[in-house]
Amino acid sequence: MDSRTEIEALQQILHHEWGADEQVDWTAVEAQLSTPLPADYRDFMAVYGGGCIDDLIVLPPLPTGNGWQASITGHIVGFRELWNMDGGAPGVELGADRVLPWGSGCNANELGWLMTGRNLDQWPVVVWRRHENPHWALFNCGMAEFLRRLMTAEFDECPLSDLSLWGRVGTFVHHEEQERRFHAGLDPMTGEPNPYTGMFNRQPARAPRRQALVVPPATPKSGLAVSASR
């Protein structure tokens, strides 16, 4: 599928009622990242924007300026440190400068692209799974297709070390809607009244409160082959 077809296929299962056009300045993004980004990701930002599918954060490219701290630029250093720490995905010779994050969450999974060449729309997805060995796996699909196949269980097995979205379609909520709900005393994801309102200082509840990933201690690397799904 091309990028437009992939985002349309994703919209067939993942409602965008609580999404919003991120209105990204793609020229500024390319200047910050030294690369353009795949078309399906750009389409996702136009339809859904940055936010969460349940516990899976889809990162906007740049900081939002509204207190929601997750962004691709904020996660690059930690994501690449994980790649270096494990020596990358088994069977992949590319260095850490060739991986770029786009998602995070679901019990410490980190998602990104392996920048394999100039054809951005052919970049496969790489995933770091905290509870798997080897930690890194490679999937021969783009970001939008990955999300769709995760929620429709179309991989041979769950590509994450967390089953919360495996074969189950979550709810997407844009980061601005999450913040609005939080300050209104509502649960940022469900919109239901939050019984804990007023007990804590009101910081954005669903946004990750870190600028970079927390890199865990190194573990012995397995010699298993790359886990790939086609």
Q: What are the language-model segments listed below?
A:
Residues 18-19, 118-121:
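Helix-boundary capping/turn motifs
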Residues 51, 108, 119, 152-153:
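Short loop/turn segments at secondary-structure transitions that flank enzyme active sites
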Residues 110-115, 124, 137-139:
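A short secondary-structure junction signal
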Residues 114-119, 127-129:
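Low-complexity, glycine/alanine/valine/leucine- and proline-rich hydrophobic stretches
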